[in-house]
């Protein structure tokens, strides 16, 4: 609850249990920060719930994480590498799959050295988009401020998908440059 700034942990855990019980392939993503530096404990917990695939990312300054207090919990590259090293070892021990999803946060050599084979690139408008509770379509799940592509409740999907902004973001993502478009200029995106 502290990490996301809202109550909901118990509901989230129940949702994971329900998804696993229904036979759905369930993945859990965790933004890594000083509040959950012992990510290995999180992996053990979700493994007990039946989760076998996890992703993690750096703490992205978007949405509720835009506050100074939240940004103060961000891990340095060295801290993030240490947390990931332990996470990869724990995932191997538990027979889980793990991927790091923040493009540009750690050098490719570091990720490969940790045994991570997927080197993240931005997937905005290419492999992922998201819908906010009020129906706004955003380029990715972290893109919570600024650019919206339309409203799923009121706009035709093809107008959103084929819109000029969506096409421009998708074209940039398709270059697979291992950067986050949210962080261009300040390197603080995904």
Segment roles from a protein language model:
Residues 2-124, 128-138, 144-151:
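Radical SAM enzyme [4Fe-4S]-AdoMet core and its adjacent flexible, acidic
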Residues 112-113, 136-137, 141-190:
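Flexible mid-to-C-terminal extensions adjoining Fe-S/redox cofactors in radical SAM and related proteins
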């Amino acid at each position: 609850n502290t990490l996301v700034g809202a109550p909901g942990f118990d509901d989230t855990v129940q949702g994971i249990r329900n998804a696993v019980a229904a036979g759905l392939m369930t993945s859990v993503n965790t933004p890594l920060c000083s509040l959950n530096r012992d990510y290995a404990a999180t992996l053990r917990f979700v493994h007990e719930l039946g989760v076998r695939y996890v992703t993690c990312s750096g703490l992205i300054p978007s949405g509720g994480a835009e506050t100074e207090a939240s940004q103060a919990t961000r891990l340095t590259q060295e801290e993030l590498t240490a947390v990931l090293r332990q996470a990869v070892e724990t995932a191997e021990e538990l027979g889980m799959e793990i991927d790091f999803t923040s493009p540009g946060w750690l050098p490719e050599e570091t990720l490969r050295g940790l045994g991570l084979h997927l080197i993240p690139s931005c997937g905005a408008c290419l492999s992922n988009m998201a819908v906010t509770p009020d129906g706004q379509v955003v380029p990715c799940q972290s893109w919570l401020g600024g650019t919206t592509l339309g409203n799923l409740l009121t706009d035709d999907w093809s107008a959103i998908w084929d819109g000029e902004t969506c096409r421009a973001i998708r074209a940039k993502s398709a270059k697979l440059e291992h950067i986050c478009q949210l962080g261009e200029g300040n390197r603080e995106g995904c």
